[in-house]
Amino acid sequence: MTTSHRPQLEARSGAKAAAYTPTGIEHARLLPGHTTLKYRKFKEEENLRANCAQEDRSNDKSLEEAVMNEEKQDVVGSGNLQETRSEKDQKDSLQELLVTQKNKVEDKAELEGNEQLKGGNSSRRSWRKGTAFGRHKVTKETNIKEHATKKSASGYINDMTKSEYHQEFLHKHVR
């Protein structure tokens, strides 16, 4: 494997001259790593930390319970407020539902109006099924105008530009 993909840390200028000054670039693989050691932690310290964490959690739970008790008292005292809030919430949600339904109907109407996004007629043949020379009949007329007005009756065309398929293609997609 070549080393040409690696950075050039020192220019190769033959023998190290007196004017040689090393660059400040250091390769990442040459830098020292893992210079510190992990020491074992004493189990006593870990137990103290775990106990402190459990006490904090229990304090948080007691605070949450106090807040819940206050809310229950507020709910008992203000039953009518809760009912009006729920009614307002229901009205808001109904309005949002109506707006989203209206938007869906508008989007559907736009999609139906867009002719390019329509599926089209399923009876149309795929463009992949057509061939350039294979299924087209030869016209014996030399006049192209006559060929355009009159359909050929027998044989195959060896010139793609005079084929009926090519004329239809030009009419559909180019003109």
From Swiss-Prot:
Its main location: nucleus. GO terms for cellular component: catalytic step 2 spliceosome; nucleus; Prp19 complex; U2-type spliceosomal complex. Residues 1-20, 53-159 are annotated as: Disordered. Keywords: Coiled coil, mRNA processing, mRNA splicing, Nucleus, Spliceosome. It holds the Pfam family Cwf_Cwc_15. GO terms for molecular function: RNA binding. Residues 53-74, 84-94, 139-149 have a biased composition (Basic and acidic residues). GO terms for biological process: mRNA cis splicing, via spliceosome; mRNA splicing, via spliceosome. It is found in: Nucleus. Residues 85-110 form a coiled coil. Involved in pre-mRNA splicing. Belongs to the CWC15 family. Belongs to the CWC complex (or CEF1-associated complex), a spliceosome sub-complex reminiscent of a late-stage spliceosome composed of the U2, U5 and U6 snRNAs and at least BUD13, BRR2, CDC40, CEF1, CLF1, CUS1, CWC2, CWC15, CWC21, CWC22, CWC23, CWC24, CWC25, CWC27, ECM2, HSH155, IST3, ISY1, LEA1, MSL1, NTC20, PRP8, PRP9, PRP11, PRP19, PRP21, PRP22, PRP45, PRP46, SLU7, SMB1, SMD1, SMD2, SMD3, SMX2, SMX3, SNT309, SNU114, SPP2, SYF1, SYF2, RSE1 and YJU2. This is Pre-mRNA-splicing factor CWC15. It comes from Saccharomyces cerevisiae (strain ATCC 204508 / S288c) (Baker's yeast). The gene is CWC15.
